[in-house]
Amino acid sequence: MIKVAAAGGGTGGHLYPLLAILETLAKRVDVKVLFFAVKGKIDERVVRKDHPEFETVSIDVRGLLRPLHHPKNLWRTLKIGIATIEVKKHLKRFKPDLVVLTGGYISGVVGLAAKDLGIPIFVHEQNVVPGLAVKVLSQYAKKVFVSFERTRDYLREWQDKIVVTGCPVRETEKEAPLKDFVLVLGGSLGSEAINELMEKVYPELQETQFVHSTGSDDWTERLSVFPNVTALTYIDPMGAYWKKAIASISRAGASTIAEMMYYGVPGILIPWESSAESHQLENALEAERLGYGIVIRENEASPRKIIESIDKVVKKGKIEKMKENPASKISEEILGEIM
C-alpha cells in the first residue's frame, strides 16, 4: 500500500484532473488517500460524495487577492499560516509516501507543509500559464507534470523536472442517452453570458440538436422551451456526454479543453476574460493552434458569429480520440519514482 496526500481545489478545473490521477493510481496499486479540501468549495462536496473511502479534511483558507499588496491580504496571509500549521499536524499523523498537487491556493499550503516535512511532492499544471502555487512549488517538486509543451517557457529553471503529459480526464463507463449533438457548457463560473447568447442562437438552428448544461434551475426551465435543446442544470459524469457530442461550445478552462481534446470533439471556445493571468485565453489559443477549436473573444461573440462557427466545427467532424489518458502516464511516472 502507498499513502497519498492530495490537494487541488477551490474549482473543478483543479479538482477533476486530481481525481483522475488518484483514481488511476488506485487501479494500479492499493492506495490510501488523505485529501485536503477547501472549506465550502466544490472539492469538499464532490470528494465526500464520490470517494467516501478517502479521509477528507476541510481547510479554511482563501487565496491571495491581486494585486498582491491588496490590504485584505494581510488577514489572508495570517489564515494561510494557521492553515499550514493545521495541515502539518495531519501530515505528521498520516505519514504519506508522497503528495500530489494540482494547483489552487490549497496546493500552496499543503505543498509548503510537505516540503518542510521532507515528503516527496508531485505537481500537475493544467493551464498553459502556470498559477502562483505551481510556480512556487516547482522548485521543491520531484516532478512537474504539464498539459502543454508551451508551459515550459514559464518554468525555465525547472526544465529537468518537467514532463509533458496532457491534462488528466476522469473516465466513465456511462453513456449519454442521446447522440450527435452540440454540447454547450454554460453553467460554470463566469458563463452566464453563454446562456444568454445561446438563447438567441437556438431558434435559428432548429435542425441542430443541443445538450446545454445551464448551471441553474432557472436557466434549465428557460431553455427547455426550445424543442432542439436538452437543458440540464448539471451534467455528471461529463465524459458520458463528451463521448456522444459532435461539437462543443464552452469557456476555455483547462479541464474542459482536456475533455474536448481527449474525446476528439472540436469546439468553439469563448475565454472568460476575467480568468487569472488570462489563463483561459492562453488555453484557448493553444487549443486552436493544435487544431481543436475556434476562439471567439467574449466582446466579439454574437449569435451570427456563433451560428457560422457551429457550421464550421460540425463540418470539421470529430478528431481522433487520444489513445491514452494523461492520468496513466502521470501515475506511471509517480510509481516509478517512489517504488
Curated annotation (Swiss-Prot):
Alphabetized UniProt keyword annotations: Cell cycle, Cell division, Cell inner membrane, Cell membrane, Cell shape, Cell wall biogenesis/degradation, Glycosyltransferase, Membrane, Peptidoglycan synthesis, Transferase
Q: Where does UDP-N-acetyl-alpha-D-glucosamine bind?
A: 11-13, 127, 170, 188, 235, 280
Q: What class of enzyme is it?
A: transferase
Q: Enumerate the GO terms in the molecular function aspect.
A: UDP-N-acetyl-D-glucosamine:N-acetylmuramoyl-L-alanyl-D-glutamyl-meso-2,6-diaminopimelyl-D-alanyl-D-alanine-diphosphoundecaprenol 4-beta-N-acetylglucosaminlytransferase activity; undecaprenyldiphospho-muramoylpentapeptide beta-N-acetylglucosaminyltransferase activity
| Known EC number | 2.4.1.227
Compartments where located: Cell inner membrane
One Gene Ontology cellular component annotation held by this UniProt entry? plasma membrane
Q: Which CDD domains match?
A: GT28_MurG
Question: Family per UniProt?
Answer: Belongs to the glycosyltransferase 28 family. MurG subfamily.
What is the protein name for this chain? UDP-N-acetylglucosamine--N-acetylmuramyl-(pentapeptide) pyrophosphoryl-undecaprenol N-acetylglucosamine transferase
Its taxonomic placement starts with: Bacteria, Thermotogati, Thermotogota, Thermotogae, Thermotogales
